[in-house]
Amino acid sequence: MRSMNLTKNAKFESVRKNIEHYLSTDWFMWVCFLIACFITVLRVEVIGLLIFAAIICAILVFCEDVIVALEPFLLLCLCLIKCNNSYDEFIKMVWLAVPAAAAIIFHFNYYQRKLPHGELFWPMLAVSVAVTLGGLGKITAKEYFSLMPIFFTLGLGFGMLLFYNLMNSHVRLRENYSLPDKISKIMIIMGLFCCFMILEYYGEHLDKVISTHGLLAFQWRNNASTFLIFALPFAFLRSIKGNHGWFWVGMLFYGCMMITGSRGGAIVGTAEVMMCMIALLCLDKRHRIHNIIIIAVGIVMFFVFFWDLIYFFRDMLLRLLQIDDNEIRVRLMRRAVEDFLSNPVFGRGLGYFGNRDVHHSAKGALC
């Protein structure tokens, strides 16, 4: 089938390989980064969805290597984290599912490969079964088969198993580049764009920062800090393996994570940086003395500006230290225990909406 496709589409193959070569370059990754920056500055997330959807569809058609689509996909996800409660706006874009499905079907048909069972197949299968059977005996058939629950149940259940098998067959070691190196570049560019979003927001509201001498509160801070948590280790990894300048990129990620004001980001990010520092000192022997000096200076600067930092981060620290019993997170934790005890084997399931009295999720979302 593969050889027949190549013979039949020789002209397409010639054009395709040239396009794939460009789309696989670092230059194209930075072009996507700049597009995402313009989308953020101009506040045109809906147009951004169209642009990146077109880019991803083009990649699926012209690129055998699906890893190329990862960077624009992550940048698109970051662009959309600002769009809170936008179900009514984005549901109008549901027609995009048609070209997206066509591109996906074309890709996995034209670039056919066997679907081997990877090392995680059986654990993924167990998770898929658990998600599918979730809520058994506790929710009604109407609740289970309503639109949003069944969408998430299929997508996060056997849909993820199918996705894993497809990716496992198409993402493989390449001769022209190192896969770990490629992924680290993608994650770092994603992190840099996230930093751009945060710093751009601070720049736009700089007068408020100066007047309050404190953090800005914004709706998407937890999402942004989550993306930075994923990106941060890759900067330190590149610092260990190559240019020491990547160390400062990692510190930029941590700094931006802190100024989001996310409590989870502050806790996890600080622990993550500490682990990365330990790895850096143990593995990067060439710059060990240099790194020790930098860390020592950083600790001294922290204590010199201790009270200034405490004042700047006061809102986050207060929210971290003064957790009220009626806070949504605390009530949800309590409710989680109750829900588990009510059905220890199958749980409540993704179709259960009985916790909306504690936290009313956005339209089109489960939580």
Language model: regions and residue ranges:
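Membrane-interfacial loop-to-transmembrane alpha-helix junctions, especially the N-terminal start
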Residues: D26-F28, V61-L74, R113-A126, L179-M187, ...
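Structural signal for the C-terminal ends of transmembrane alpha-helices
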Residues: V41, C57-V66, A101-K114, L162-N176, ...
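Alpha-helical transmembrane segments of multi-pass inner-membrane proteins
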Residues: A53-I56, T132, L154, F158-L162, ...
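Aromatic-anchored transmembrane helix interface
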Residues: F90-A101, E119-T132, A141-N168, K182, ...
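Long extracytoplasmic/lumenal interhelical loops at the membrane interface
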Residues: I323-R334, E338-S342, F346-C367
